[in-house]
């Protein structure tokens, strides 16, 4: 099947000063999304989209690279201040938060953990025996 040739949508550079960085750290991957204050996505990146495959996606280094990539895209839109919202139990979670704070020209306003916790809802999966 031939690739579709058409006009690609041009990325419009917005001038947004404040944003929110959502870090979703699962056991298998880390997804970083940068939004404006209204929740509209400005930039995103993940360990898998950067070329990490298999078990390498879940490493702290892959999470750090995903954050740096997403923040580089967001800086093109003028982001200077961000809040951080972290979700999930993944191994790349702490490294991702530290690497947001280490980026030059970005000021962190707040940090919040939004991991959903059940009030004794569904039964969890059985323990893994290796």
Curated annotation (Swiss-Prot):
Taxonomic superkingdom: Bacteria
Gene3D superfamilies: Ribosomal protein S11 (3.30.420.80)
A UniProt-annotated Pfam family: Ribosomal_S11
Record-level Gene Ontology MF annotations: rRNA binding; structural constituent of ribosome
The keyword RNA-binding is annotated on this UniProt entry: yes
Keywords: Ribonucleoprotein, Ribosomal protein, RNA-binding, rRNA-binding
NCBIfam families from the UniProt entry: PRK05309.1 (NF003698), uS11_bact (TIGR03632)
Protein name, per record: Small ribosomal subunit protein uS11
Organism annotation: Nitratiruptor sp. (strain SB155-2)
Gene: rpsK
């Amino acid at each position: 099947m031939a690739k579709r040739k058409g006009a690609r949508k041009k990325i419009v550079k917005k001038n947004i000063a404040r944003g929110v960085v959502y870090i979703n750290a699962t056991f298998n991957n880390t997804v970083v999304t940068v939004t404006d204050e209204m929740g509209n996505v400005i930039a995103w990146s993940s360990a898998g989209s950067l070329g990490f495959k298999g078990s390498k996606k879940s490493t702290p280094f892959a999470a750090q690279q995903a954050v740096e990539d997403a923040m580089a895209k967001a800086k093109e839109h003028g982001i200077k201040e961000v809040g951080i919202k972290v979700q999930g139990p993944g191994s790349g979670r702490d490294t991702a938060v530290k690497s947001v704070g280490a980026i030059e020209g970005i000021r962190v306003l707040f940090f919040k953990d939004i991991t959903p916790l059940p009030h004794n809802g569904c039964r969890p999966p059985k323990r893994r025996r290796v």
